[in-house]
Amino acid sequence: MTNIEQERWSRVKGRLRTTVGEDVYSSWFARMDLESVQQESVHLSVPTRFLKSWIQTHYSERVLSCWQAEMPEVHRIDLTVRTAMRCAAPAKEQAAPIEPRREDNRAAAHDLRVSATAPVSANHEALGGSPLDPRLTFSSFVVGRSNTLAHAAAKQVAEGRRGDPVMFNPLYIHSGVGLGKTHLLQAVTWAGNSGLERKVLYLTAEKFMYGFVAALKSQTALAFKEALRGIDVLVIDDLQFLQGKTTQAEFCHTLNALIDAGRQVVIAADRPPSDLESLDERVRSRLAGGLVVEMASLGEELRLGILKSRVTAARAHHASFEVPLPVLEYLAHSITHNGRDLEGAINRLLAHSKLNAQPVTLEMAEREVRDLIRPQEPKRIKIEDIQRVVARQYNVSRSDLLSSRRTANVVRPRQVAMYLAKTLTLRSLPEIGRRFGGRDHTTVLHAVRKIEGLVSKDAALSDEVESLKRQLQE
């Protein structure tokens, strides 16, 4: 990919993010990559068939229009599924063009095939499990300050034995893209199944959905439910993609049945339970009742450790591959987005070094990873963070902000918090109202306008609001 194409792709992603909103973009488009640009067509890729089908069905026009705003000559978007190194590599599929409002119901049926790559036996054919990557084990996971708790909790789950008391259930791990959630979940599955004492099943939310739909169509829903409830440890990845009221209801019943029976459930998503707005309130409540752990962004020390680990792994197949420490330090300092970019950087250096028979140098690294060095993204601020910081600033409790109390010492902090939620997050007025004790959107709008008017006249309040913004953005 040329630098010009990379710049165009960055602008298209920016338009798409603005058009659909931050939450929709994070859920459906964050893992979309640009593969190539031709005269009248653009080739994009996504990691799963489910994402491909969903984007084609629901967002084809928007993706195409965003590209046409950048390149009017583009009339076609080809969307394919990236193949990844798995225990059993999936068959390559032909690129399918995105066409406006194209309905593709074959994708669901195609994905109902049994995947035998996850090492678990089940009594229902839809529970073969999702593919596991043999590289994603505890031994290859690099531990740092941002993921210590998540790693420790996952390790404890993996080392448990059948009949042991469950300390936290479910274990819910959330983070942004590429920070290690899937690595930990697959490590739990590999380790849990190694002793053959417990049945540990790894499923993506996509696989769960398709398995349930297949069971309904084949009239084997009861067998599907019984097979799921016979699992000792159920591991669900990318829960934010769970769609459909019927499927969510079945997931909720399964979750309750497993937890009530003392079986372990481990879940990962890209946001905390309270932010999974598409999920039923009962599901969010049950998820929040377990151990919720956030994996924060990777610090520079952890990034350096990941890079060293990837070099060591590469040397298992390429013994002469060497990356000088100054190069690793440069990469750790410059590539700050996620672990996948770090791995991609090592893969590029390996390919360039081997194909050109050249040693890795700092100049080579600067040239090869230029497009991976992104501007520092602003911190994503959550409504819970705003409520916590405002409550601390005004010496009230978070429950006061959510309550119906109308005393002056509570009303003003609540209005300030609503104002900050509107100005610092992408949440809608109705959603902000719901997060402040179920208030109407007109209440939020009144609070926003009230504080907007006051900060222009009240210097003290203006200073307080700016101080709160700085605290939240640090």
Curated annotation (Swiss-Prot):
GO molecular function: ATP binding; ATP hydrolysis activity; DNA replication origin binding; lipid binding
Localisation per UniProt entry: Cytoplasm
Main location, first listed in the record: cytoplasm
Region (Domain II): 73-130
Entry keywords, A to Z: ATP-binding, Cytoplasm, DNA replication, DNA-binding, Lipid-binding, Nucleotide-binding
Annotated stretches, region: Domain I, interacts with DnaA modulators: 1-73
Region feature (Domain IV, binds dsDNA): 354-474
GO biological process: DNA replication initiation; regulation of DNA replication
Gene3D superfamilies, sorted: 1.10.1750.10, 1.10.8.60, 3.30.300.180, P-loop containing nucleotide triphosphate hydrolases (3.40.50.300)
NCBIfam families in the record: DnaA
Free-text function comment from the UniProt entry: Plays an essential role in the initiation and regulation of chromosomal replication. ATP-DnaA binds to the origin of replication (oriC) to initiate formation of the DNA replication initiation complex once per cell cycle. Binds the DnaA box (a 9 base pair repeat at the origin) and separates the double-stranded (ds)DNA. Forms a right-handed helical filament on oriC DNA; dsDNA binds to the exterior of the filament while single-stranded (ss)DNA is stabiized in the filament's interior.
HAMAP family named among the record's database cross-references: DnaA_bact (MF_00377)
Quaternary data: Oligomerizes as a right-handed, spiral filament on DNA at oriC.
Family: Belongs to the DnaA family.
Protein's name in the database: Chromosomal replication initiator protein DnaA
Species in which this protein is naturally found: Rhodopseudomonas palustris (strain BisA53)
Protein's gene: dnaA
